[in-house]
From Swiss-Prot:
Its EC number is 3.1.-.-. SUPFAM superfamilies: Eukaryotic type KH-domain (KH-domain type I) (SSF54791), HD-domain/PDEase-like (SSF109604). Belongs to the RNase Y family. PROSITE patterns: HD, KH_TYPE_1. SMART domains: HDc, KH. Its main location: membrane. Residues 118-141 are annotated as: Disordered. Pfam families: HD, KH_1, RNase_Y_N. GO terms for biological process: mRNA catabolic process. The gene is rny. This is Ribonuclease Y. It is an enzyme of class 3 (hydrolase).
Length: 535
């Protein structure tokens, strides 16, 4: 910075000196001109007459020369000032370049110093770490030295004891001590390994179950025991009841469903614990309303027709569920059996949806463990199929399911899965265990089942089974939410007098075998029909 100031000052001084030099020269020229003028005037005085013209000429010449000299001097001064300015600028430029180079060198030197400082810091840290490590090693060596000294003292003491023993006795003592130490160490390691394996197994199982539950979004609606049928107007209620209640009695006796007609506008309630019978009654009632012809013969015709239609719908439900679960080549009879589960509930949970859910969960778990996914899904889907027919065949749903699985030549893993999913038989495969876990997941999750609903349905089912256990009974239907049991008998086996006796026997068996609130009305119906055709 000082050099720059000096350069600027030098330039200013040069300019001042140049201007002063030019002024001096101009002054000298002026003085010379004045002197010449004076001489001319003197000569003019002497030779006035002759010199007037010459004096004028000389005067003009002097003026021209003075102007010429002034211009020349100005040009020379400007040229010198220009040259001097260029020299100063050149020097200033070179000084500036030197300053830039100096700044660059200083910056590089600063970076170099910073790097060296960082290197020194890192080396200092490394040295501190090594020093700490050496200190720790020194402490460890001291501790080991103390242990060695202690062991030497113990060995000396042992040797003093062994000195009085034979070689065999000494060897036996040493082997026993070594065995005790190794046994303790091995036992500790085994316990640690078992604890670690158990923890990892539990964690893995929880992860698998959590993943399976997150990947399955099942839909579920709690099953009901009533169905509402909407009427076009309230006048239809009288036609449904019929003359002296013939129509409604015929519908109830053929379907086993309680038809409730109350003050609710334009609605008839169908109540019954068997979803298949309730659905047949709903289809029949809706067909009667749409057709307009409501009488006992038409009711019988539509009930029979809707029973056949229900068989087709059951097959369609089974096919849709088998397609959803991915169970190809399923026997047609098994498809129909699975379709019937759409109308079965377990603790209020739809059994067909439960079976599909178990199949999907078992497939997810099998995929995580590298097992056969398709077989796991099939086994999970079929595990509860015995519930579809356990009312018609003796035995638990597990035994019935095993029998039908063997009958239709299902895979042995599927048979064992059905047999073991409630713990009655030991599982023979990983898939059987996975299906049992999936079954527990599906049924035990909050909201899946309703204990009170299942108890209610079981009470109605037991009520019907008591009635049908007597010889000569054709059908029995629990009505009025279990407050009435209506029994249809075979007229060729049961006489009018035996009807009264049968009602008393049924009442006594109900009182001894069932727990129920209030009273249960037992109604036995014997109907004799004679049909002939005129030709």
């Amino acid at each position: 910075m000082v050099n720059i100031i000096l350069l600027i000052v030098s330039a200013l001084i040069g300019l001042i000196l140049g201007y002063a030099l030019i002024s001096i020269r101009l002054k000298s020229a002026k003085e010379a001109a004045e002197l010449t003028l004076l001489n001319a005037e003197q000569e003019a005085v002497d030779i006035r007459g002759k010199a007037e013209v010459d004096a004028e000429h000389i005067k003009k010449t002097a003026k021209r020369e003075s102007k010429a000299n002034r211009k020349e001097l100005l040009l020379e001064a400007k040229e010198e000032a220009r040259k001097y300015r260029e020299e100063i600028e050149q020097e200033f430029k070179s000084e500036r370049q030197e300053l830039k180079q100096l700044e660059t060198r200083l910056a590089e030197r600063s970076l170099t110093l910073d790097r060296k400082d960082e290197n020194l810091s890192s080396k200092e840290k490394v040295l501190d770490s090594k020093e700490q490590s050496l200190t720790d090693k020194s402490k460890h060596i001291d501790e080991r030295q103390l242990q060695v000294e202690k062991l030497e003292e113990e060995k000396k003491a042992e040797l003093e004891k062994v000195a009085a023993m034979t070689i065999a006795e000494a060897r036996e003592v040493i082997l026993m001590e070594t065995e005790n130490k190794l046994t303790h160490e091995i036992a500790t390691r085994i316990r640690d390994a078992e604890r670690d394996i158990k923890d990892r197994t539990v964690k893995t199982a929880k992860d698998l179950l959590a993943q399976a539950m997150q990947r399955l979004a099942g839909e579920y609606v709690t099953e009901q025991t009533i169905t509402s049928v909407h009427l076009p107007d309230d006048n239809m209620k009288g036609r449904i009841i019929g003359r002296e209640g013939r129509n409604i009695r015929t519908l109830e006796s053929l379907t086993g469903i309680d038809v409730i007609i109350d003050d609710t506008p334009e609605v008839v309630i169908l109540s019954g614990f068997d979803p298949i019978r309730r659905e047949i009654a709903r289809m029949t009632l809706e067909s009667l309303i749409a057709d307009g012809r409501i009488h006992p013969a038409r009711i019988e015709e539509l009930v029979e027709k809707n029973r056949l239609e229900m068989d087709n719908r059951i097959r369609e439900y089974g096919e849709a569920a088998a397609y959803e679960i991915g169970a190809p080549n399923l026997h047609p009879d098994l498809i129909k059996i699975m379709g019937r589960l759409q109308f079965r509930t377990s603790f209020g949970q739809n059994v067909l949806r439960h079976s599909v859910e178990v199949g999907k969960l078992a497939g997810i778990l099998a995929g995580e463990l590298g097992e056969n996914v398709a077989l796991a899904r099939r086994a999970g889907f079929l595990h509860d199929m015995g519930k579809a027919i356990d009312r018609e065949v003796e035995g638990s749903h597990v035994e019935i399911g095993m029998e039908f699985a063997r009958k239709y030549k299902e895979h042995p893993v599927v048979v064992n899965t059905i047999a073991s999913h409630h713990g009655d038989v030991e599982p023979d495969s990983v898939i059987a265990v996975l299906v049992a876990a999936a079954d527990a997941l599906s049924s035990a999750r909050p909201g899946a089942r309703n204990e009170s609903m299942e108890n209610y349905i079981k009470r109605l089912r037991d009520l019907e089974e008591i009635a049908t256990s007597f010889d000569g009974v054709q059908n029995s239907f629990a009505l009025q939410a279990g407050r009435e049991i209506r029994i249809m008998v075979q007229p060729e086996k049961i006489s009018d007098d035996q009807v009264v006796i049968l009602s008393h026997k049924v009442r006594e068996k109900i009182e001894h075998n069932l727990d129920y609130p209030g009273n249960i009305k037992v109604t036995v119906i014997r109907e004799m029909r004679a049909v002939d055709y005129a030709k």
